[in-house]
């Protein structure tokens, strides 16, 4: 297996949330229903989900993305569409579908890469995109996403 260093910005798209909802302005429910969606914030608990809210669905962020809390560096795979609070970026893989296994691998690598950052630093997108990750390589330049999935999936 060969490994290569990549800039996070060469592997991931860092997108702003489709809408920012402040906790003091929304009705947060404890339980999921058919009419509400996860409300992802900067917490380190419960996959970043503070609760569930019912808001304008055009502001939902896509499923199968990674939520990244900019001032806590908390990262979680989000398997369904979700709303966010303030300072949460939405990450997707460039040129490849993001699965839970691939996200788990990437988040582990990013946690290692961000381990020297101070908690409470509000990471701007330019800084985030320049952090280096070591990833398995498929060809000279392409990360091996299938291998990442196999490593996490156990086969």
Give residue ranges: language-model regions.
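Intrinsically disordered, low-complexity regulatory regions enriched in Ser/Pro/Gly/Thr
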Residues: 32, 59-60, 124-126
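Glycine-anchored helix-breaking recognition loops at helix->coil/strand junctions
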Residues: 71, 87, 106-138
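Beta-strand elements of modular eukaryotic interaction domains
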Residues: 29, 79, 122
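Short loop/beta submotifs within extracellular cysteine-rich repeat domains
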Residues: 47-48, 75, 98, 114-117, ...
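Non-catalytic DNA-recognition/assembly elements of restriction-modification systems
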Residues: 1-46, 139-155
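Generic structural signal for residues positioned in beta-strands
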Residues: 7, 36-39, 65-67, 90, ...
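A short beta-sheet element
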Residues: 50-107
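Structured beta-strand/turn binding interfaces of compact recognition modules in eukaryotic regulators
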Residues: 43, 94, 136
């Amino acid at each position: 297996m060969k490994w290569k260093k990549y800039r996070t910005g060469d592997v991931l798209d860092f997108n702003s949330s489709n809408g920012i909802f402040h906790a003091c302005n929304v009705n947060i429910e404890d339980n999921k229903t058919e009419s509400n969606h996860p409300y992802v914030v900067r917490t380190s608990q419960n996959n970043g989900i503070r609760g569930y809210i019912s808001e304008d669905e055009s502001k939902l962020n896509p499923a199968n993305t990674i939520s990244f809390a900019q001032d806590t560096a908390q990262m979680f795979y989000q398997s369904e569409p979700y709303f966010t609070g303030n300072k949460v970026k939405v990450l997707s893989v460039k040129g490849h579908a993001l699965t839970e296994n691939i996200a788990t691998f990437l988040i582990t690598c990013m946690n290692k890469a961000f381990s020297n950052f101070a908690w409470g630093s509000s990471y701007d997108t330019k800084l985030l995109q320049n952090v280096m990750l070591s990833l398995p390589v498929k060809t000279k330049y392409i990360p091996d996403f299938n291998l990442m999935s196999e490593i996490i999936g156990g086969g």
